[in-house]
Amino acid sequence: MDILCEENTSLSSTTNSLMQLNDDTRLYSNDFNSGEANTSDAFNWTVDSENRTNLSCEGCLSPSCLSLLHLQEKNWSALLTAVVIILTIAGNILVIMAVSLEKKLQNATNYFLMSLAIADMLLGFLVMPVSMLTILYGYRWPLPSKLCAVWIYLDVLFSTASIMHLCAISLDRYVAIQNPIHHSRFNSRTKAFLKIIAVWTISVGISMPIPVFGLQDDSKVFKEGSCLLADDNFVLIGSFVSFFIPLTIMVITYFLTIKSLQKEATLCVSDLGTRAKLASFSFLPQSSLSSEKLFQRSIHREPGSYTGRRTMQSISNEQKACKVLGIVFFLFVVMWCPFFITNIMAVICKESCNEDVIGALLNVFVWIGYLSSAVNPLVYTLFNKTYRSAFSRYIQCQYKENKKPLQLILVNTIPALAYKSSQLQMGQKKNSKQDAKTTDNDCSMVALGKQHSEEASKDNSDGVNEKVSCV
């Protein structure tokens, strides 16, 4: 842009396109005395810089000039950024719906993923469109200056919330592997929501200094007309607190979780191979279902038993979940690391580095980081069957899973042992009463028959007696 404004040869090369676009040449009609501008006037306007000393690069930064000189480039950029925005919003809305409606997905880890989807969705709604607008305006801030600090605050807030959620998920999974009894006993829906609130509170606290100081001093959020963090202290401290420290915790806990799962799987396989019998903890009450679930992961019983098979299955499920989360962690790190590393380099080698190159890299890397918010729903779709089936139904506007007729047949063919003993006793009493009533009716009918036969025989005997007496 600066080259086009400063070099006369570059400006004269654009006259061919100006001669072909009569409608666009009217943009310069205000600079001439005549009502309509012709091609020679346009040529003189671009070349005769001596007679027009007030012409500068600032005049070339108007929206009409930008749309004329960079029409093709800006349209491609707008198209790519619009695709990222649509994928981010639509995909994360599907994740929120899936966790809210599917009972299979309602657990602590998926609640964290739903909150992460909310952060990514808000990033697509509030931050990405404004960033796309700045691209169209040549990375100049086109909105009121007070909104610049608010926009940077939202950008840092949602990006920090994303990595804080991933860090919290990694810690939660590690605690669940290391201490399953304590984790299962104290891990409820309420506790999960409290952890999510804590994550959002930390994210707000980290990003709050930006609007506090940025609204008071515009120089902290403006640099040469562009809306960005211009304070080196903000850049350094914010990068380490909001990204590098949580990243270190997330990576360490994730690898410790993988190591613990491998160790547990090795122990379980060795127990199955050697058929070693360990303590059975038979003193536990059979009616305590929660206690049984708590010890399924930490107790290995006789090989071939139901508990041993289920322990191995639980380890396999944990490994699959860690695989999916590992892919999410890896993509987030790969997509955001270039931006934060370049951001730190811009502060450290401020004098020796080329600011134009650093600025261009930051503009590209920030959108690669935004792309991670759109990738997460795709990962869930590829590696989780429940998410995949839920997304396909939601796209078809089917928000409830269709029940198969076989399920109704199974409900109607429940064996008698599935009922409670009290229900069986009541049924037996009812049947015994009906049998007794039937027996009484039968007995009464027999009695009536006997009575009728006795009366008939009595009548006959009376008749005989009467006849005898008469004789």
Swiss-Prot record:
Pfam families: 7tm_1 (PF00001). A motif (NPxxY motif) lies at residues 376-380. A motif (PDZ-binding) lies at residues 469-471. It is found in: Cell membrane; Cell projection, Dendrite; Cell projection, Axon; Cytoplasmic vesicle. CDD domains: 7tmA_5-HT2A (cd15304). Residues 451-465 have a biased composition (Basic and acidic residues). Glycans are attached at residues 8, 38, 44, 51, 54. Disulfide bonds join 148-227, 349-353. InterPro entries: 5HT2A_rcpt, 5HT_rcpt, GPCR_Rhodpsn, GPCR_Rhodpsn_7TM. The keyword Glycoprotein applies. It comes from the Eukaryota. Changing residue 242 to A: Decreased ability to bind serotonin and psilocybin. Detected in brain cortex (at protein level). Detected in blood platelets. One of its GO terms (biological process) is memory. A motif (DRY motif) lies at residues 172-174. The chain crosses the membrane at residues 81-97, 112-137, 147-171, 192-215, 233-258, 323-348, 357-382. It is a multi-pass membrane protein. Its main location: membrane. Residues 98-111, 172-191, 259-322, 383-471 are cytoplasmic. Belongs to the G-protein coupled receptor 1 family. The PDZ domain-binding motif is involved in the interaction with PATJ, CASK, APBA1, DLG1 and DLG4. PANTHER family: 5-HYDROXYTRYPTAMINE RECEPTOR (PTHR24247), 5-HYDROXYTRYPTAMINE RECEPTOR 2A (PTHR24247:SF30). This is 5-hydroxytryptamine receptor 2A.
